[in-house]
Amino acid sequence: MQITVSGLPGSGTSTLSKLLAECYDLELISSGEIFRRMARERGMSLAEFGALAERDPSIDLDIDKNQKAIIHSRENIILESRLAGHMAQGRSDVIKIWIKAPLLTRVKRIQRREKTISFDEELKKTVERERSETLRYKNYYGIDITDLSIYDIVIDSEKWNQYQTLDILRVAIDALVGPE
């Protein structure tokens, strides 16, 4: 089984990917974690590293090339990243999930997780990060990140807690996969 989980920052992709990986005994590969680690290794914030990635396309291109290779060569994985679904486009055997939530909800979640700055600062930072990513994806691949038509499942994580959202996703995934 191969699953991609995508969504904007703070939508719950990391949490739900971990829960899905546990439920289905799948390996979790998170490009967001790779990106955050690369930023830390350079002593940069996510916003600073995102700005660097805007100037240095090799950062995104390397991460995305790696994602594409993974989704086309490995089984029993969950690939979690903003573009994971797009990296699996054309693969009907891969279950593509988009997790969504309103901006203010996402910013509250990020602020709670990061515990570093005020809500207004986090809002500004998140909007800038999303603007940066949207621009890069459009420039590099012609991808409109707001077009959700490639996804098999789109779910709003604001409506339910993480476990309720997981239960809904499991029912949908099991229906798509069929009996084992």
Curated annotation (Swiss-Prot):
InterPro entries: Cyt_kin_arch, Cytidylate_kinase_dom, P-loop_NTPase. It catalyses: CMP + ATP = CDP + ADP; dCMP + ATP = dCDP + ADP. CDD domains: CMPK. Gene3D superfamilies: P-loop containing nucleotide triphosphate hydrolases. It is an enzyme of class 2 (transferase). The keyword Cell membrane does not apply. It is found in: Cytoplasm. ATP binds at G7, L8, P9, G10, S11, G12, T13, S14, T15. GO terms for biological process: pyrimidine nucleotide metabolic process. Keywords: ATP-binding, Cytoplasm, Kinase, Nucleotide-binding, Transferase. Its main location: cytoplasm. Its EC number is 2.7.4.25. GO terms for cellular component: cytoplasm. Signal peptide: none annotated. Pfam families: Cytidylate_kin2. GO terms for molecular function: ATP binding; CMP kinase activity; dCMP kinase activity. It comes from the Archaea. Belongs to the cytidylate kinase family. Type 2 subfamily. HAMAP family: Cytidyl_kinase_type2. This is Cytidylate kinase. It comes from Methanosarcina mazei (strain ATCC BAA-159 / DSM 3647 / Goe1 / Go1 / JCM 11833 / OCM 88) (Methanosarcina frisia). The lineage of its organism: Archaea, Methanobacteriati, Methanobacteriota, Stenosarchaea group, Methanomicrobia.
